[in-house]
Amino acid sequence: MLNDPIITDRTIFARNCVVRKIPCNEADKFLADNHIYGSASCRYCYGLFVKRATGAAEKKSAPDSRHENAAIEGWTPRGQYDSLITGEPVAVACFSNARRWEKNGRSVCSYEWVRYASLKDSRVVGGMGKLLAAFIEDHHPDDVMTYAISTVAPGRQVRTGYGIGKSEADNADFGNAFRKLGFVEESRMTFPSRLVEGEMSVSIKFRLKLTY
């Protein structure tokens, strides 16, 4: 998920943040800087923005290079070692357009959760759940599906699946962040890594059923 998930300089609490819809081009910029696979084609994008910062965990400093990564309107860097600034984007979630089919005599409206990323130097506690809840409230899906992907890159563990591990055994349950949100595993597959030649990735398909 993140470009450098091992380094988490601070913890950010989603309860101190606010969700806003954002244009896809703004989400693309954030994802290019903070998601290992970059941006993707999406229909609906949401950002999580700092409303207030409290607690020692949120006061750790980050280098100014991080400030170059967030060009979303309403956020202005104030200094090289400011940690959290009101209006700063700390996470982004992107979803597909609706896909519809018939199931048991009724129309089912399904969406894919395509991307989620938080700032690469941070861990956003409750961020995934808060962004997902906002999307569900706006669009009332019958279900939401997504994929968690885990692999290993040179010198670091890549966390595209919202979990992390150094070996195949460590990665057995790498999709736990989805499970905690109510998603159920439907299938998993192994395939050659897109990031590292000779390495294998594991992909788990998850689905959150909301109305059936």
Language-model regions: role of each:
Residues M1-D9:
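Short, structured interface segments
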Residues T8-P154, S167-A169, G175-N176, K180, ...:
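A conserved beta-strand-loop-helix scaffold within acyl/acetyltransferase catalytic domains
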Residues V158-G165:
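Short, conserved, GDST-rich strand-edge loop motifs in beta-rich repeat architectures
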